């Protein structure tokens, strides 16, 4: 008579029946034993899963629990995850939609072993690997689909890209899968005969994967033909690839950690913009880049809005990760990372130290793509904050998803924070700033020093600012730019054809209230490693994320706004509403500056003095819209001729702003302006301790020569304007012929930044000094406020014997 168990077993479908141990093949008997060690042997074949990790996963559950018990939620979950990770057999049709997104693995299995040369594909010539470098752990790079020819069969491409010729390749390929099984087994708590049934299914899965690996090894030769070897960085001469997906996997394993296997890392998609910072992470035209950061178990699952198949694939993977971490958020929206996505593996309840952590962002190639790819205009902001070398340091990563969905602010043991998305203004563009803190001496993952990627000693910043969707209406639109803080901060304009960096202070002040709402200005200041960040403070607090930064110093009014790329345009600091800081720290609008402000600043400051010049002649130039003004500069009345745009404003003593064409000045800058006429005395502030008229260019001016001071806009603009000094012959002394960009200062105001100046100087003047640091519009105004009165001024005490000639004149005030 049959037992109850046998009878109930017969009632079950064939696949659900319990197969007696005696009827199983010899290779299946071992895993079905109730012993923990034997139960876990089923996953021992997976090279990426060391025995200790596997056994630990098996012992978490009571007797009878199997590694596959976590899959009792449904076999579909296991298969969906396998599909999401693209570990399905090559014959499976479900691998076709994701054929171009399967990463090929090249990694060493253990964290302590040295890294062998990695094979890379032909990437865009500006592509660079950026990753953690404070530890000599294992680093791997996954760049498969660029290697696959466009005409390759999708299934064949998927298999070829996943195949590995060596055992380490296979290990790293299945490492995530094996770890997932182990972790899911550790979460299993329900013993019973179903465990044995699912163990049986696990064995079938293992056999399928083993068979798959054999086929992949045979096809590996095809892939090797498309691989090109590089010392670690794609050379600039590499031809740009076709539009395909790029995968980069950067993982770090500190030597002092006991992590034995890398947790599963889900691919993350980035759509690069064409106007990336040139000397940092720059991605090619229309290709996609998938960044995988597996540092100490950190997983990042982003939002992908391109394909339905990929979307569902990632959704399944996210669900699997939620199960893996023991946390289910059934109601959460796709794209809003859960604590499982944000946090480290919580198995040990202790986060592993690692150099830095990052969040990923979905960025579309161009602003026009936003409407087609993401109608709701979803954006993401990313900031990677540095982590100190000590495990106790608090590292926090903010991700602001400008989505109106209800987000969740999570804070787990790893110190990761998900910032609440601010309500975005649909007319504004997103911004992404990624900052790391590699020192020049720290080796990067590919073995190159930090200086190979970043110029100077500034902390590396991967910055991206998308194109402005809302046109700026003033002449010489202020291009978006990125400030890299450091000992000598860099201002990097983004989106401009002239990608040149000019020295600037790490503070940005928008030139007028009109632009205060434009979120294209970023200030990234170096943050203390131990400082705790509140993500809500960094994320936009209002509808206009004008500035996302750690801190901004308004009193330090350094002009970081560069003028328009077109030379004939004027700098924005003349715009009505621009803030100028006086020597006493007072802030005034540019249109409110008075002569007393200049005199008071010169009296208060020990470094500034007022230079003056008298207009002697105003003539039309051969070029349209340009006037030639002749000045008598200083007490020696050195003759200087300057070519200036007719709308360029100068500050006249006792009168205020004046220009050759007040109508155009008012039209462009909305700045109240008077007509500049012969006899007007233009004043500006200059530095006493400068020997050369230009701090930046270092003009060779003798003590008897005049001070050539350029407008702040000129210095900041990157010296786009050429100024030539010619001796007028009226005075004694030799005149120097100078051709410098934005370096000259004119007595009226600061030099005209947008138009070339021809200055005829009588070098009978004392050594000229130019204030280069006042390049900012606000700072320039400060300079002007400190300008010394000209010879004609009734304040001779301010005019030393060696009065310097400031040809810039009004450009200082124009700030």
From Swiss-Prot:
Q: What else is known?
A: Self-association seems to be necessary for formation of nuclear aggregates which are associated with pathogenesis.
Under which name does UniProt file this protein? Ataxin-1
* Upregulation: ATXN1 protein levels are directly regulated by PUM1 protein: PUM1 acts by binding to the 3'-UTR of ATXN1 mRNA, affecting ATXN1 mRNA stability and leading to reduced ATXN1 protein levels.
Q: Mind naming one GO cellular-component term on file for this protein? A: nuclear matrix
Cite the entry's keywords alphabetically: Cytoplasm, DNA-binding, Isopeptide bond, Neurodegeneration, Nucleus, Phosphoprotein, Repressor, RNA-binding, Spinocerebellar ataxia, Transcription, Transcription regulation, Ubl conjugation
What is the name of the gene encoding this protein? ATXN1
Modification note: Ubiquitinated by UBE3A, leading to its degradation by the proteasome. The presence of expanded poly-Gln repeats in spinocerebellar ataxia 1 (SCA1) patients impairs ubiquitination and degradation, leading to accumulation of ATXN1 in neurons and subsequent toxicity. Phosphorylation at Ser-775 increases the pathogenicity of proteins with an expanded polyglutamine tract.
Domain AXH, first and last residues per copy: 562-693
What does the entry note on its domains?
A: The AXH domain is required for interaction with CIC.
- For the cross-link Glycyl lysine isopeptide (Lys-Gly) (interchain with G-Cter in SUMO), the position is 16, 194, 609, 696, 745
Per UniProt, the short sequence motif Nuclear localization signal occupies residue numbers: 794-797
Instruction: Describe the task this protein carries out.
Output: Chromatin-binding factor that repress Notch signaling in the absence of Notch intracellular domain by acting as a CBF1 corepressor. Binds to the HEY promoter and might assist, along with NCOR2, RBPJ-mediated repression. Binds RNA in vitro. May be involved in RNA metabolism. In concert with CIC and ATXN1L, involved in brain development.
């Amino acid at each position: 008579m049959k037992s109850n168990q046998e009878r109930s077993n017969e009632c079950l479908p064939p696949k659900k029946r319990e197969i007696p141990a005696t009827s199983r093949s010899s290779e299946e008997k071992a895993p079905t034993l109730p012993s923990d060690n034997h139960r876990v042997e089923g996953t021992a074949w997976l090279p990426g899963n060391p025995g200790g990790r596997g056994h630990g996963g098996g012992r978490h559950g009571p007797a009878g629990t199997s590694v596959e018990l976590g899959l009792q939620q449904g076999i579909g979950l296991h298969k969906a995850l396998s599909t999401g990770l693209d570990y399905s057999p090559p014959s499976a049709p479900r691998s076709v939609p994701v054929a171009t997104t399967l990463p090929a693995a090249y990694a060493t299995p253990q964290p302590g072993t040295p890294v062998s040369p990695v094979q890379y594909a032909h990437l865009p010539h500006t592509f660079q690997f950026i990753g953690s470098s404070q530890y000599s752990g294992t680093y791997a790079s996954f760049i498969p689909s660029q290697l696959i020819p466009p005409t390759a069969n999708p299934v064949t491409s998927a298999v070829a890209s996943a195949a590995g010729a060596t055992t380490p390749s296979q290990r790293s390929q299945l490492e995530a899968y094996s770890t997932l099984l182990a972790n899911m087994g550790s979460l299993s708590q329900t013993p019973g005969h179903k465990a044995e049934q699912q163990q049986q299914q696990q064995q079938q899965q293992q056999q399928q994967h083993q068979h798959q690996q054999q086929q992949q090894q045979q096809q590996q030769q095809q892939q090797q033909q498309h691989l090109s070897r590089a010392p670690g960085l794609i050379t600039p001469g590499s031809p740009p690839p076709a539009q395909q997906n790029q995968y980069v996997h950067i993982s770090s394993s500190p030597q002092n950690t006991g992590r034995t296997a890398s947790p599963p890392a889900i691919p993350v998609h980035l759509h690069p913009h064409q106007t990336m910072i040139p000397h940092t992470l720059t991605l090619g035209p229309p290709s996609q880049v998938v960044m995988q950061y597996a540092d100490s178990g950190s997983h990042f699952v982003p939002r992908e809005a391109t394909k339905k198949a990929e979307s569902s694939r990632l959704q399944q993977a996210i669900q699997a990760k939620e199960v893996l971490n023991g946390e289910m958020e059934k109601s959460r929206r796709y794209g809003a990372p859960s604590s499982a996505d944000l946090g480290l593996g919580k198995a040990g309840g202790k986060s592993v130290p690692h150099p830095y952590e990052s969040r990923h962002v979905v960025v579309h190639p161009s602003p026009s793509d936003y409407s087609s790819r993401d109608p709701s205009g979803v954006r993401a902001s990313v900031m990677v904050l540095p982590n100190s070398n000590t495990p106790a340091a608090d590292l926090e990563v903010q991700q602001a998803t400008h989505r109106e969905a209800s987000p969740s602010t999570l804070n787990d043991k790893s110190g990761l924070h998900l910032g609440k998305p601010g309500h975005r203004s649909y007319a504004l563009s997103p911004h992404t700033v990624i900052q790391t803190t590699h020192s020049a001496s720290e080796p990067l993952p590919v073995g190159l020093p930090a200086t190979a990627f970043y110029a100077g000693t500034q902390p590396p910043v991967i910055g991206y600012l998308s194109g402005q969707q809302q046109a700026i209406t003033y002449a010489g639109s202020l291009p978006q730019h990125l400030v890299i803080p450091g000992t000598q901060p860099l201002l990097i304009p983004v989106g401009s054809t002239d990608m040149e960096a000019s020295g600037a202070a790490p503070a940005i002040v928008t030139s007028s209230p009109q632009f205060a709402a434009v979120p294209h200005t970023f200030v990234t200041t170096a943050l203390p490693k131990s400082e705790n960040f509140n993500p809500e403070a960094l994320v936009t607090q209002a509808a206009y994320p004008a500035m996302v930064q750690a801190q901004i110093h308004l009193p330090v009014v350094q002009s970081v706004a560069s003028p328009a790329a077109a030379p004939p345009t004027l700098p924005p600091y003349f715009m009505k509403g621009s803030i100028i800081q006086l020597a006493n720290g007072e802030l005034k609008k540019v249109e409110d500056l008075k002569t007393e402000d200049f005199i008071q600043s010169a009296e208060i400051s020990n470094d500034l003095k007022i230079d003056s010049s008298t207009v002697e002649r105003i003539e039309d130039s051969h070029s349209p819209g340009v006037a030639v003004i002749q000045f008598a500069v200083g007490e020696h009345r050195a003759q200087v001729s300057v070519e200036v745009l007719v709308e360029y404003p100068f500050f006249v003593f006792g009168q205020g702003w004046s220009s050759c064409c007040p109508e155009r000045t008012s039209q462009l800058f909305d700045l109240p302006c008077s007509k500049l006429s012969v006899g007007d005395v233009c004043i500006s502030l200059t530095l006493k301790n400068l020997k050369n008229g230009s701090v930046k260019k270092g003009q060779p001016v003798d003590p008897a020569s005049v001070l050539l001071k350029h407008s702040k806009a000129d210095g900041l603009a990157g010296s786009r304007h050429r100024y030539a000094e010619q001796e007028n012959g009226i005075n004694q002394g030799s005149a120097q012929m100078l051709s410098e960009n934005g370096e000259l200062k004119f007595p009226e105001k600061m030099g005209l930044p947008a138009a070339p100046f021809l200055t005829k100087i009588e070098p009978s003047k004392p050594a000229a000094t130019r204030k280069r640091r006042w390049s900012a519009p606000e700072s320039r105004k400060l300079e002007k406020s400190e300008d010394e009165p000209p010879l004609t001024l009734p304040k001779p005490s301010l005019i030393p014997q060696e009065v310097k000639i400031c040809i810039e004149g009004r450009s200082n005030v124009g700030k």
